[in-house]
């Protein structure tokens, strides 16, 4: 008989529920949230598992890799679908969540999430760490600006290189302000150094990656955009059509249709928010900074004239997702005009 298992993952102990092909609960347990412990539990049960599932989350990729390596058929469940399916339960517990997910897996009522390769996960972790240091650096600078502004001291529009010198000029001769500015400037210098180190590592990865270099032939797409997009997609073959990529990253409008009502709303904003951000930034650069014209930019400018600049940037970001995927899948580079594309 077929058996299906669900794992509701927690930091220390995970709830496991096993059901048979009829939906009857065969076993339930609390198991340590370690790949070795879960593999041991499933092997010692003596059952043949058709599918084991767990909700996508911070530890899920790690557990998925361990169980898959042990030979089990493992799927990651899309978080929004799990939440919607289990939302009707009046009692939310880890045990009930595992039971509900086990039935979802048995019936096939779920959307699987792509499990990324280990190398891709490492690059994603590097990008997250870089982004966090960048955010903390910006927070520190804004905090220092705010403190000084309270005393009528305005830094004004200064670049990163002149920031520290300008602060010292403003607080000179004011003992209290000097005493609080000094440790904050030291912390800023340390953050800048560590951020620069991570940024250099990202650039090194991009230089040695043929796919990233190909994606960077698109105007407006720099190293960070290219590597962020590549790490998020991981495998271009998982999208049957390039046009699906924009929807995957939440860049297509939501739609509500019921009876005579049929309306489109704002973009869905599902999927990876960081990818949406870098694609929007790339669209901004193409529209406002890249001087050379292309068929893609001309199209976006026509949208801007009729729908406004912000909508044009969103539409261009969606187009960029499609173009980047197509270049990756085809192994081609960006063509600036339709004529060049036709002759290729």
Task: Annotate the PLM regions.
Residues 214-217, 223-224, 228-309, 343-344:
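Phosphate-backbone recognition surface of nucleic-acid-processing proteins
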Residues 49-57, 101:
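Acidic beta-strand-to-loop metal/phosphate-binding motif
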Residues 35-51:
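Short, basic/hydrophobic alpha-helical segments
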Residues 1-20, 101:
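Gly/Thr-rich phosphate-binding beta-strand-loop-beta motif of the actin/hexokinase/Hsp70
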Residues 12-36:
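Short glycine-rich, Thr/Ser-proximal phosphate-binding strand/loop in the N-terminal lobe
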Residues 75-121, 125, 132, 163-171, ...:
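Short alpha-helix plus adjacent loop in nuclease-associated cores
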Residues 260, 297-344:
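Low-complexity, acidic/Ser/Thr- and charged residue-rich accessory regions of DNA metabolism proteins
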Residues 127-214, 338:
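Glycine-rich, often acidic, oxyanion-interacting loops/wings at catalytic, nucleic-acid
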